[in-house]
Amino acid sequence: MTESITIDCLQYAAWSEKIFRQMRQGNVDAVHVTIAYHETFRETVANVEEWNRWFAAYPEVIVNACSAADVRTAREQGRTAIIFGFQNCSPIEDDLGLVQVWHRMGVRFMQLSYNNQSLLATGCYEREDPGITRMGRQVIKEMN
């Protein structure tokens, strides 16, 4: 039997070297990191760039991961794999083509809405629930 992999399935924190090292000490193998709640494309690019600086500064403890193989490799190397995700698809704005751009930039989770109505779907705070929008269906098709 192989050892299990420990994944923190959703995290938002005041990231720092201390936290990165605590994750390693706690044997956290991977973290789904929120890089966008309601940010625009440009604001989210800035978040990715901040993470790229952290990857360069702390390569012994964290690494960007885009696949299950990346997570396994990080674990074998004693590093925590960082997986980018959105809590809301606002960074794709109204441009379907940005789905692929974000995929190439390492985003692997895209939640259609957070709490409020988005261009893609209804959030849990909305009184009426019309579900997934036309654009939401197009984005899902593009993601798949």
Residue ranges and their predicted role:
Residues 138-144:
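Substrate-binding cleft of carbohydrate-active enzyme catalytic domains
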Residues 1-134, 138:
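N-terminal hydrophobic targeting/anchoring segments and the immediately downstream early-domain regions
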